[in-house]
Structure formats: C-alpha cells, structure tokens
Curated annotation (Swiss-Prot):
It comes from Teredinibacter turnerae (strain ATCC 39867 / T7901). Its main location: cytoplasm. Pfam families: DUF150_C, RimP_N. GO terms for cellular component: cytosol. One of its GO terms (biological process) is translation. Required for maturation of 30S ribosomal subunits. Keywords: Cytoplasm, Ribosome biogenesis. It is found in: Cytoplasm. NCBIfam families: PRK00092.1-1 (NF000927). This is Ribosome maturation factor RimP.
Amino acid sequence: MAGKHTQLEELIAPVVESLECELWGLEYSVQGRRSMLRIFIDKQPDGVLVEDCEKVSRQVSSVLDVEDPISGEYTLEVSSPGMDRPLFKLAHFELYVGHRVALRLRVAFEGRRKFQGLLKGIEDGEIVLEVGEEEYLLPFELIDKANVVPQF
C-alpha cells in the first residue's frame, strides 16, 4: 500500500500546489471493491475555503481519470485538516511541539499501541511524548496514525 500511497501523492501534489494550496497529506484505503481517497489540503495565511476544496476535487478527479491509478470505483474526499488535524510527516510533528497529540502505533511499544500526551519534541527521528509523569521516545516509523488533540 505504501507504493500506491507514494504514487497517489506524486500525482496529486503538483495539482494541489498549482491551486495555491499545500497537500497536507492523504489517506488511501480499500474496502471490498471500493476505494476511498481522502485528501487534506492547507492554505496560508487564511486557511482553506470550501471553494478551495471544490477546485482541488475537480482538478484531482480529472487527473485520476486520465492517469487511472485507482482501479474500480472510488470515493474522493477533499477537506482541510481541521482542528484535530492528522500528522503525516515528521515535519508536521515539529510544527506541533507543545500541543497534545494522540498516536496509534503499528505494533505495541512497551505493551501499548495507543498514546495521548504532550508532544515535547523530536530527537533523532523519534517523537518525544509526555504521558502523565512518563516520557516516551516513540520511533516515527512505528506510528500508524497521529492527530492533534484540540484543547478548549
């Protein structure tokens, strides 16, 4: 699936950037005979508008129709990352040092797969996460899913 993810990202990123947005990340999944492609875009300085999502959706859809990287039927969703934005890249974690994050790992680390705590920093490609009185160094490559936890 990583190969498909990379292929999709390489097709989609130039389209998103041509519309003056940033490809924050994407999620691709297959369930049965249907595929789901979620594209998260960001835009500085004012954020993403519905019109931005519509433009990106139309343009990406056209590229996908021509290049045909997804066989069969698929659903395409385009949105902003939102307040609970997913963190896809190490650079995303660097932007959110000092914020609370939730992580799910691919495999258990010290007997757990789920963590939620304060993102303290990045050290040698590892996420430094404070959970209560404990501090964990979690290898980035073990992270399956991560997102910012909004504070109200």
